[in-house]
């Protein structure tokens, strides 16, 4: 009990957050500095940010719109999920000077289940597109697919290169604003093309999500069609709202971390 009381006292003056890329460690950040950093990132109250715009609608109105859209796709939103995500940041201690990673997330959110299911669907489409290019590479010896789900393929490629002993140099690049600078319409158009390509490949015209996986099916009940998947993608990207305290913002370019 005494330890818990001491932690609560610390929280009066400090924000306790995990450290980026060091999840077992925590940082104690001055609460005033933490809030000022968030306001500066959002450029509030000046409203000069190209990425985040102040939304004049209240949170309840936006949540109701999210619930209505999800219901149109067959989702029933739990009361505990009828909220908007919030913005926070964690320090990048591996950077000099110390950097900041801004994150918009929440344990509960009105579009949480839809977003999770769309993510599972795109993992299915990813494997389909990857298999297509694997076959193309087999026949043409020309690789057009440069997307990886994790570091395993990269490590395997490095290992094969090391065995050949013919590598001259290796370079890595880090895009600090890779996700937050993608124009929404460009992203929506590219994903729509991937959806069109994937749905044209087989006879099954619906995708169902069950548990952790998505699969192709002939059954349209509780499934995504090509059109409803496009609608879901468009909505999740273009209607992304979050809060800082009781202030509502809309992300107008890029996607959240």
Briefly describe each language-model feature range:
Residues 84-131, 176-188, 227-243, 249-257:
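Conserved pre-motif C helix in the palm subdomain of viral-like polymerases
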Residues 29, 34-36, 40, 124-138, ...:
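Internal, charge-rich low-complexity segments
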Residues 3-7, 35-42, 58-59, 63-73, ...:
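Generic structural signal of hydrophobic/aromatic residues within well-ordered alpha-helices
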Residues 1, 19, 32, 56, ...:
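Generic preference for well-ordered alpha-helical elements
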């Amino acid at each position: 009990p005494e330890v818990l009381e001491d932690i609560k006292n610390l929280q009066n003056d400090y924000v306790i957050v995990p450290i980026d890329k060091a999840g077992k460690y925590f940082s104690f950040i001055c609460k005033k500095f933490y809030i000022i950093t968030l306001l500066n990132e959002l450029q509030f109250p000046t409203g000069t940010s190209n990425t985040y715009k102040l939304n004049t609608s209240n949170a309840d109105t936006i949540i109701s719109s999210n619930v209505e859209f999800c219901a149109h796709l067959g989702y029933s939103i739990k009361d505990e999920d009828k909220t908007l995500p919030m913005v926070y940041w964690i320090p990048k201690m591996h950077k000099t000077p110390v950097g900041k990673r801004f994150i918009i997330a929440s344990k509960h959110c009105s579009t949480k289940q839809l977003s999770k299911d769309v993510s599972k669907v795109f993992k299915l489409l990813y494997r389909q597109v990857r298999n297509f290019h694997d076959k193309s590479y087999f026949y043409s010896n020309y690789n057009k697919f440069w997307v990886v789900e994790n570091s395993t393929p990269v490590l395997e490629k490095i290992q094969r290169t090391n065995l050949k002993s013919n590598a001259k140099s290796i370079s890595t690049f880090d895009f600090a604003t890779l996700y937050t600078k993608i124009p929404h319409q460009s992203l929506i158009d590219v994903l729509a093309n991937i959806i069109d390509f994937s749905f044209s490949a087989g006879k099954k015209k619906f995708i169902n999500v069950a548990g952790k996986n998505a699969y192709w099916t002939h059954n349209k009940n509780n499934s995504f069609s090509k059109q409803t998947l496009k609608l879901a993608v468009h909505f999740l990207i273009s209607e992304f709202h979050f809060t800082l305290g009781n202030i509502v913002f809309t992300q107008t370019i890029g996607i959240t971390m």
